C-alpha cells in the first residue's frame, strides 16, 4: 500500500487509548522486584549463555554486500539546458546566530532545476541510469526528486546551491493545498504532514542513489543565507524560523500562529476535556512546532495537517520516505535548513563516506526513522545538533513500527549535541542498534563541547521502547562537556532532589524524562532495557579548573512517575539490564557522585575505571512507584 494511503488508514483506525500501556498495581510491582539480587544473578547467567549479539550486526552488514546496479547510460544535466552560475560574497549566518561572509549564487543566476528534473525524467523513462551534475557552481530553485533506478551523481567540484526561497519548495509537490502551496508528504519531528519539499526528496522509490566523487561534491542548503527578494514571510533566513535571538512576536515556529485554529474547529465533536488536555494552558499549542503534534494526538488525518506557506516548519535537506535499496555516498552537505538526512520507513539504506557539515539549529546529521536495515559507515559529522539521532515517530504516528537493525561504524563525530542519539521521537520503538569503532572527537571542546557521546532521550509523551543497543570500541580524546546542563523536572516533582546532568555533561546518558514540560499529554511510560557498552576510552582535558573528561561518567534517569498524567494504574518500568564493561571514563568533575541512577535495575559495571578507581559491581536504584487514583505514590527506593 502506498505510504500516504497507509498513513490515512492508520490515523483513522487507531484511537489514542490504544497506545496506553496496561497498568500494574503496587503489589504487582513490589512482587516483580522482591528479589533484585536473584534477578541480577539470573540475568548474568543468561548473558553468559546467549549467543554473541554482534553476529546480528554482521548479518545486517551482509545485506549490503551486493552493490546497487544501474543501467550504463549517463544523462548529463548540461544536455538538458543547465548552465553554471557565478558566486558573490554576502553577509549571512555561518552558523546559528553567528554572522559572517558567505558565497551564494549571484542575483539572476540561471536555474538548473528544470534541467535536473528533465534529466531524471529521461533517465527514469529509459529504465534508469546515471544523472550527472558536472564540475561547477549550480543554482537550483527547486527540489531534486529521485526516482526508481536513477543514480544522481555529483562530479568532483560540483556544488549545488539550493535557492534561499521557500516558495521554490512549495510549487512542485503533488498535493495542491491552495494558498499554502503545492506541498509534499513529509514528516517533521516524528509527525506526518504536508509541507515544503526537502531539497532532495523521494517517496516510494526503489534502487536509488545519490553520490559524489569526493567531498568537493557539495549540496548546499543555504540555511543561513538571507531569503531572496520577494519572499516576505517571517524572518530573514531558514535558520531564523527556529526563533532563536528574535524579538518575542517575530513569526517563527515557536510563536502562536493565527493560521492554526483550535482543535474543535478541526475535529468537530472532540471531547472538551480531551481538547484541553492536548492543547494545555495558554497559546503554546498554537505554535507550528506544537500544533502538528497536537493534530497527531487528536487523530487528525495527514491530508488535513497542511503547513507550507503561512507556517514555519523548515524542511529537511534530504528526505526519503518509503524507499528501499538506497545508496548515499561520497558527498558533502552544508548549511541545511533543518535535519540533513531523514529517511522514513526505508529499508536497506547505506550511507557511506558522507561529510555532514552544518551548524544551524536542528542540524542533525543523520536521522533514520522507522527504518529497517541501515548501515552508517565511514562518515564525518560536524553538526549544530545531534550527529546521529535514531527515531520512530511521535504521538499516534507509529504505523511504520520501530527502527531496527542499524549498524554505525568507523565514524568521526567532530562536534554536536549528542554523538549517537536515540530519540526523542521514538514512540514506535527502537531495537537492535549496533555502534562500533567511533571517535567522538569533540574538536570544539573549549567553547562548544559535545554534550554527551551516547544518548537516549524520551519521556512520558514520546514513550516507545529501546532494547538491544550494543556499543563498543569508542574513543573520546577530548571528553565531553565538563559543565553540566541540568534536568528540569516538572514543578512539584518530588522524586529527584539533586542536580542531574541529563542534558549535557555525561558520557553515557539515558534520559527517560527528557524536557517533560514540553508536552501536555504524558501518558506513555517508555521501556528501556538490554544495553551493552564496552571499551569506552576517554581522555581528560585541561579546563583551567582541573583536568577532567566530563561532569559525570553516566546518567541513567529512568521514567519519573510524577511526570505521568494518564489513566491511573499504569506501571512505571525501570531501565533494566545495562552492562558497561572494560571502559575508562577519565576523571569526572563531579568526583563525589561520578554517576547518577534513578529507577534503574541490574546495572552492571564490569572492569570500569572512573577517576582511576576500578568498579566491579551491580547497581540498582528503583523507586517502586505507581499511580493510584490519579496521585503519584512512591513506596521506597531499592538501592
What are these regions (language model features)?
Residues 314, 322, 345, 362, ...:
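Exposed loop/turn and edge beta-strand positions of beta-sandwich/beta-sheet ligand-binding modules
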Residues 79, 85, 93, 110-113, ...:
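Asp-box/BNR beta-propeller blade signature and adjacent active/binding-site loops
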Residues 445-639:
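Extracellular beta-rich repeat passengers
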Residues 219-240, 349, 353, 550-569:
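C-terminal/domain-terminus segments
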Residues 2, 9-151, 155-322, 329, ...:
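Extracellular "leader-to-stem" segments immediately downstream of a signal peptide or signal-anchor
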Residues 120-122, 140-147, 339-345, 378, ...:
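Short, T/G/N/S-enriched strand-turn elements that build extracellular solenoid repeat scaffolds
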Residues 128, 141-142, 163-165, 222-225, ...:
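Short glycine/acidic-rich loop motifs that flank beta-strands on beta-rich extracellular proteins
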Residues 156-157, 206-217, 324-334, 347-358, ...:
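Right-handed parallel beta-helix
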Amino acid at each position: 500500500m502506498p505510504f500516504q494511503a497507509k498513513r490515512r488508514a492508520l490515523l483513522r483506525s487507531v484511537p489514542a487509548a490504544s497506545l496506553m500501556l496496561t497498568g500494574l498495581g503496587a503489589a504487582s510491582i513490589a512482587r516483580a522486584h522482591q528479589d533484585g539480587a536473584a534477578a541480577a544473578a539470573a540475568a548474568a547467567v543468561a548473558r553468559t549463555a546467549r549467543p554473541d549479539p554482534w553476529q546480528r550486526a554482521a548479518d545486517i552488514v551482509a545485506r549490503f554486500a551486493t552493490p546497487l546496479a544501474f543501467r550504463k547510460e549517463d544523462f548529463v544535466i548540461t544536455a538538458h539546458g543547465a548552465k553554471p552560475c557565478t558566486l558573490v560574497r554576502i553577509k549571512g549566518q555561518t552558523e546559528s546566530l553567528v554572522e559572517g561572509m558567505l558565497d551564494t549564487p549571484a542575483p539572476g543566476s540561471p536555474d538548473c532545476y528544470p534541467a535536473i528534473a528533465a534529466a531524471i525524467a529521461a533517465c527514469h523513462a529509459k529504465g534508469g541510469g546515471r544523472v550527472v551534475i558536472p564540475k561547477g557552481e549550480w543554482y537550483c530553485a527547486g527540489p531534486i526528486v529521485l526516482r526508481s533506478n536513477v543514480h544522481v551523481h555529483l562530479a568532483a567540484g560540483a556544488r549545488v546551491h539550493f535557492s534561499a526561497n521557500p516558495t521554490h519548495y512549495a510549487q512542485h509537490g503533488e498535493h495542491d493545498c491552495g494558498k499554502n502551496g503545492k506541498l509534499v508528504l513529509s514528516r517533521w519531528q516524528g509527525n506526518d504532514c504536508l509541507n515544503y519539499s526537502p531539497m532532495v526528496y523521494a517517496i516510494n522509490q526503489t534502487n536509488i542513489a545519490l553520490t559524489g566523487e569526493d567531498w568537493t561534491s557539495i549540496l548546499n542548503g543555504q540555511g543561513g543565507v538571507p531569503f531572496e527578494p520577494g519572499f516576505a514571510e517571517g524572518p530573514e533566513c531558514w535558520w531564523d524560523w527556529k526563533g532563536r535571538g528574535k524579538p518575542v512576536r517575530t513569526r517563527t515556529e515557536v510563536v502562536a500562529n493565527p493560521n492554526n485554529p483550535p482543535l474543535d474547529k478541526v475535529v468537530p465533536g472532540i471531547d472538551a476535556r480531551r481538547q484541553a488536555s492536548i492543547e494545555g494552558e495558554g497559546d503554546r499549542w498554537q505554535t507550528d512546532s506544537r500544533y502538528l503534534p497536537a493534530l497527531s494526538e487528536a487523530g487528525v488525518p495527514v491530508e488535513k495537517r497542511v503547513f507550507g506557506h503561512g507556517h514555519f516548519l523548515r524542511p529537511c535537506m534530504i528526505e526519503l520516505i518509503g524507499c528501499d535499496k538506497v545508496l548515499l555516498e561520497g558527498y558533502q552537505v552544508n548549511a541545511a535548513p533543518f535535519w540533513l538526512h531523514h529517511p522514513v520507513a526505508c529499508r536497506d539504506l547505506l550511507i557511506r563516506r558522507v561529510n555532514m557539515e552544518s551548524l544551524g539549529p536542528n542540524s542533525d546529521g543523520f536521522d533514520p526513522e522507522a527504518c529497517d536495515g541501515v548501515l552508517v559507515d565511514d562518515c564525518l559529522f560536524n553538526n549544530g545538533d545531534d550527529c546521529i539521532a535514531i527515531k520512530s515517530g511521535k504521538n499516534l504516528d507509529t504505523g511504520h513500527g520501530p527502527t531496527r537493525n542499524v549498524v554505525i561504524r568507523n565514524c568521526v563525530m567532530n562536534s554536536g549535541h549528542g554523538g549517537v542519539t536515540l530519540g526523542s521521537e521514538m514512540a514506535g520503538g527502537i531495537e537492535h542498534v549496533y555502534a562500533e569503532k567511533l571517535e567522538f572527537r569533540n574538536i570544539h571542546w573549549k567553547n562548544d563541547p559535545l554534550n554527551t557521546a551516547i544518548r537516549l532521550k524520551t519521556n512520558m509523551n514520546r514513550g516507545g521502547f529501546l532494547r538491544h543497543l550494543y556499543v563498543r570500541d569508542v574513543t573520546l580524546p577530548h571528553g565531553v562537556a565538563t559543565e553540566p546542563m541540568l534536568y528540569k523536572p516538572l514543578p512539584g516533582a518530588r522524586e529527584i532532589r539533586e542536580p542531574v546532568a541529563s542534558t549535557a555533561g555525561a558520557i553515557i546518558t539515558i534520559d527517560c524524562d527528557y524536557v517533560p514540560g514540553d508536552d501536555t499529554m504524558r501518558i506513555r511510560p517508555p521501556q528501556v532495557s538490554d544495553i551493552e557498552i564496552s571499551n569506552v576510552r576517554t581522555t581528560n582535558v585541561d579546563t583551567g579548573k582541573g583536568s577532567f573528561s566530563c561532569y559525570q561518567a553516566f546518567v541513567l534517569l529512568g521514567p519519573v512517575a510524577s511526570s505521568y498524567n494518564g489513566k491511573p494504574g499504569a506501571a512505571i518500568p525501570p531501565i533494566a539490564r545495562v552492562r558497561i564493561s572494560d571502559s575508562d571514563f577519565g576523571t569526572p568533575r563531579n568526583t563525589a557522585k561520578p554517576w547518577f541512577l534513578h529507577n534503574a535495575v541490574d546495572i552492571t559495571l564490569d572492569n570500569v575505571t572512573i577517576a582511576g578507581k576500578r568498579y566491579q559491581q551491580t547497581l540498582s536504584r528503583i523507586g517502586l512507584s505507581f499511580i493510584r487514583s490519579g496521585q503519584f505514590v512512591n513506596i521506597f527506593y531499592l538501592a
